[in-house]
Amino acid sequence: MARIGGEIEQLGQLKATFDRESRTVEELTRVIRSQLQTTAWEGPAAERFRSMWSGEFEVSLRRLQEALVEAGAEVARRQTALVQAGS
């Protein structure tokens, strides 16, 4: 038989971790984007890299950030359900 339950406080801490790290990834993306825009770098390699950044790397970071937000929201939903079940 499956066990159901969880430590409410720990779930809250887990959600906070997902939220915090989501903001970290968002800030990391912003910092790299800004520095890439202001870095003196020209030529075909620079163009290829900037294209890869905007087409692949930044997209991957945005997806990671969104996944962390969604994971935090899911933990919050489960935490709420456990609180309601215990009431």
Language model: regions and residue ranges:
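N-terminal secretion-targeting helices of virulence/extracellular proteins
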Residues: 1-87
